[in-house]
Amino acid sequence: MSISPVELLSWYDHARRDLPWRRPGVSAWQILVSEFMLQQTPVSRVEPIWSAWIERWPTASATAAAGPAEVLRAWGKLGYPRRAKRLHECAVVIASEYDDVVPRDVDTLLTLPGIGAYTARAVACFAYQASVPVVDTNVRRVVTRAVHGAADAPASTRDLDMVAALLPPDTTAPTFSAALMELGATVCTARSPRCGICPLSHCRWRSAGFPAGTVARRVQRYAGTDRQVRGKLLDVLRDSTTPVTRAQLDVVWLSDPAQRDRALDSLLVDGLVEQTADGRFALAGEGETGRPA
């Protein structure tokens, strides 16, 4: 069984969300920025930060010219701030080695900082209309249910081949990829699928009576984790115009000093924070100079 391009594309034509990075005139760089931000982060949180980012830094060279600390500030509370650092590094390479133009092919994209298998294919597909399979959790879920009749499936080395076999052999392949992703994000969701409005008339999971999944879902806890502590420490540094003392950081997490120290050490190791000669702390690039006026 396959997935009908006619059914899927007809649905996508009227049901797709009006996301800013999908609009006409959006550049390959701006699409790349959206892909960095959308990793493990809901669309609703990404939209305002992406829009502000693109208004401020519309090109790779503009992003590269900004200091890493300003990039971290603009990233705000999107989470996983190492993505911001890698995005800045990616901008530097594109500006200096590719004349400010995002590479078109997957193999070259894979050589850029912070770009893995998914992001490389997403940029090639959505920015340059390349007919390449793009597989995220939403796409994997739709294909697993509609084609294989299971509720879920773990990531597999066969995913790319499986999705590639579904792509229509014409210029609609990139739109088909976007539609698969949209269907998984808005209709064929993990917890509460809206099968009553699904455009796919042939779905093996539905035909099989919706068998339960076998893959245990991990519930990602945030409260009390090192991620939360790292975020609180970064908040202090983002809000400061000068390096701060250890005492100013200590007060953000008094309940577990060892965890706080571990979180701070990890920020230093990741290159997101630096320590000055007198023992104070600042965002990367602002240790000696402070925040630019």
Curated annotation (Swiss-Prot):
Enzyme Commission number: 3.2.2.31
Binding-site residues for [4Fe-4S] cluster, renumbered to this chain: 188, 195, 198, 203
Taxonomic classification: Bacteria, Bacillati, Actinomycetota, Actinomycetes, Mycobacteriales
GO biological process: base-excision repair; mismatch repair
Site (Transition state stabilizer): 136
All residue ranges annotated as the HhH domain in the record: 98-126
Record-linked SUPFAM superfamilies: DNA-glycosylase
Catalytic activity entry: Hydrolyzes free adenine bases from 7,8-dihydro-8-oxoguanine:adenine mismatched double-stranded DNA, leaving an apurinic site
Name used for this protein in its record: Adenine DNA glycosylase
Keyword check for DNA damage: yes
Described purpose of this protein according to its UniProt entry: Adenine glycosylase active on G:A and C:A mispairs, as well as processing 7,8-dihydro-8-oxoguanine:A (8-oxoG) mismatches.
Active site: 35 (proton donor/acceptor)
InterPro entries, A to Z: DNA_glycosylase, Endonuclease3_FeS-loop_motif, HhH-GPD_domain, HhH_base_excis_C, HhH_motif, MIG/MutY
Disruption phenotype: Loss of adenine glycosylase activity. No overall significant change in the mutation rate; an increase in C to A and A to C mutations (with a reduction in other mutations) is seen after rifampicin treatment. No change in susceptibility to H(2)O(2).
Protein family membership: Belongs to the Nth/MutY family.
Gene3D superfamilies: Helix-hairpin-Helix base-excision DNA repair enzymes (C-terminal), Hypothetical protein, domain 2
Pfam family, one: EndIII_4Fe-2S
